[in-house]
Amino acid sequence: MVQSKTQSRDRARDTARDSGQPPYFNIDPDRALRDLDAPVGTARFAEIAEACGRGRADLASRGMDETGRKQLRLFSTWEITRYLIPVATPHFRRVLKANPDLPQGLSETEGGAKWFTLDEVLRLRAHFATEGSKAKEYRPYRPAGLPAKMVAVANFKGGVGKTSTAAHLAMSAALDGYRVLVIDLDSQGSMTSIFGGQVADEWQTVFPLLARHYAQYLRRENQGRLDRGEPPIPLDDTLGEALKVTAADLIQTTHWPNIDLIGAQLNLYWSEFQIPVWRMQARGWKLWDALTDMLEADGVLDAYDVVFLDTPPALGYLTINGLAASDILLVPLGASFLEFDSTGRFFDMLHSTFQSIEDGENMAARALGRDELAFEWDAVRAVVTRYDSA
């Protein structure tokens, strides 16, 4: 009678238990070898990746419409009046009846519950803000004349919920009526996947904005070099192409009517190698200002209310750009000792990194009589994730 692998393992476990010794004292090397599968070669990785791709496509397609795009669910009258627009349900229905030009919602049955898209909810909110009670705030708070607030979600430990936190906050802000831009700085592209972004290569990520910032600096530097009779630093084809790209070329809409996206994909990681090369060529280039300056120059911060930056699990050049650009820093961490310990080390590295930038810049600033550099954030908060008090 041929014994199965399970029966063999059970017998070995029983033998170890009867002898009073740990199970590993009774491992039979030959039997263990027979339990192993065939060796895995590199080609197997491609097969696994292909299988994962098919599974991902299947799962993602379940939330798509007939055109293959992600679609956002509808909102009921009860949800709208309970959470989104501060009006009583009977009054809400009376307003719709009195204003047939307003979105009337969809109903599966005659006289049944009405369901609305988020775009329709935003139109209804605008109507109530204009025609409704002046004692109520229908639109979200937004000081006039100020740029968008930028929120970075960062921690160099992976798996703490950075992307989930940023995505949920972006969606919550959108439900409140804010105009939201999400910038994915993580080459894994998880945030991009959440919002159904399509990113073919690094030229549809933030990379060309960083390259354009460097190219513009190099142009100014080269003019000074020419004035001094020195040879200019050449602009290669990459930098020349980057000068043609604006943020508007990179921003794509999502299935949320008031959330836009600058996505990411694997080639974005190339920035982590290219940025230090540029910095070595031009030591005066302030790489940490690249993202902020380009977003400001392209009017992005005036077109949105809140910008969320999802950073990679590392304190590299992309993360430094995101942190330097942000007004608010959120640091997610799980409720465990290891994650608490790692987060403490993250703050230590934040201090070392930004302090070294300040020290290097301010030495030159003091010598030239210029204002000193000081990084500041309006708020820094640790966000405990994956915790249930029960």
Cite the ranges covered by each PLM segment.
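P-loop NTP-binding core
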Residues: 2-83, 89-90, 94, 101-390
